[in-house]
């Protein structure tokens, strides 16, 4: 009896309370006051100078930037942004794309075979984390990705987005 839908007893829709203080918490940024004071600039998460495969994974084994101030202070050329979306994909595991790319830990892969240029040696690259994703709205999620891309571009760095799907 509890498993069957019953008109009058069960609602046929779930309403979102857009007035709730928790409605937009998926994209509320952590207040800077909660973080210890530090000089602006990219943060290296590696414990060992040799790098290796241990430690906290980042895109291309690069340092992490948390804010536009970090991008400017670090004179960053390329900021890699994760966009873990899978709402427009028939395969619902695309959301794990950015995490999987970080876990590969292969750096930039060395020199390009056509140009013989190693982007990791000529560009200052950082991991800018993931854009916040609203699992209930592709539109709101894509807007958040756009906002992070704009935030990166306004510092003069080139945004490089790794998804997810093609939402």
Task: Describe the function of each predicted region.
Residues 2-167:
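Metal-dependent C-N hydrolase catalytic cores
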């Amino acid at each position: 009896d509890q498993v069957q839908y019953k008109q009058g007893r069960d609602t046929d829709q779930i309403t979102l309370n857009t007035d709730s203080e928790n409605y937009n918490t998926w994209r509320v940024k952590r207040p800077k006051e909660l973080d210890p004071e530090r000089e602006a600039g990219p943060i290296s998460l590696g414990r060992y100078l040799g790098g290796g495969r241990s430690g906290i994974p980042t895109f291309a084994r690069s340092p992490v930037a948390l804010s536009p101030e970090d991008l400017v202070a670090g004179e960053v050329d390329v900021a890699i942004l994760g966009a873990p979306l899978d709402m427009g994909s028939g395969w619902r595991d695309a959301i794990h794309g950015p995490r999987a790319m970080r876990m590969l830990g292969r750096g930039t892969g060395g020199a390009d075979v056509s140009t013989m240029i190693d982007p990791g040696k000529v560009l200052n690259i950082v991991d800018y984390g993931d854009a916040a994703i609203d699992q209930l709205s592709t539109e709101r999620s894509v807007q958040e990705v756009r906002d992070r891309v704009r935030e990166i571009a306004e510092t003069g760095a080139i945004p490089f987005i790794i998804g997810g799907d093609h939402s």
